[in-house]
Amino acid sequence: MKVRASVKKRSPECKIVRRKGRLYVINKKNPRFKQRQG
């Protein structure tokens, strides 16, 4: 999980999800792309 100031979709499989007021990027196919907005 990377914490970034700005989160972007790094592949077409990435999904942007809002949980508890934070933005997350999740990717089932390639979990390396997981991110959270700091």
From Swiss-Prot:
Q: Could you name the domain of life of the organism this protein comes from?
A: Bacteria
Q: Which UniProt keywords apply?
A: Ribonucleoprotein, Ribosomal protein
GO CC field:
ribonucleoprotein complex; ribosome
Tell me which Pfam families the record gives. Answer: Ribosomal_L36 (PF00444)
According to its UniProt entry, the protein's GO biological process terms are: translation
Q: List the disulfide bonds.
A: none
Presence of keyword S-adenosyl-L-methionine: no
Any one GO MF term held by the record is: structural constituent of ribosome
Q: Which family does it belong to?
A: Belongs to the bacterial ribosomal protein bL36 family.
The name this protein carries in UniProt is: Large ribosomal subunit protein bL36
Give the species. Answer: Flavobacterium psychrophilum (strain ATCC 49511 / DSM 21280 / CIP 103535 / JIP02/86)
Q: Which gene encodes it?
A: rpmJ
